[in-house]
Amino acid sequence: IFFILSHTIDTVAVAISSHCELGVDIEQIRDLDNSYLNISQHFFTPQEATNIVSLPRYEGQLLFWKMWTLKEAYIKYRGKGLSLGLDCIEFHLTNKKLTSKYRGSPVYFSQWKICNSFLALASPLITPKITIELFPMQSQLYHHDYQLIHSSNGQN
């Protein structure tokens, strides 16, 4: 069994697979003042930073958090931590299409918006069925309808 954890302010994400390593990241969407601009310019690829900076503040921050969770999921999947660098992979997000550029074997990405957070999953396999359950810190279990916002075909 393979599993990985991620957490944000009041939510924990756990990804479990009986077949392969996974990468997961969850981040609560929150205001970063203008620091999201500096972070993206210093740690993302030049094209990603340009895409983020060119947007109005709110949309730029949303794109920043989408990119951040995808990058973190990928880095966790590869098992190398931040030593890989956040610019080791480049993402292009348009409508419901996600494409990526990186070196190595195919990786499949999925991303969801859950309440006020983005959740990203990286896997070497296309996973036909993904179950998401929310376990809030308050110890009550409740279920939400989740909206898939991006998915890739595993090709560079």
Describe the residue ranges of each PLM region:
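Core catalytic alpha/beta fold that binds nucleotide/phospho-ligands
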Residues: 1-156
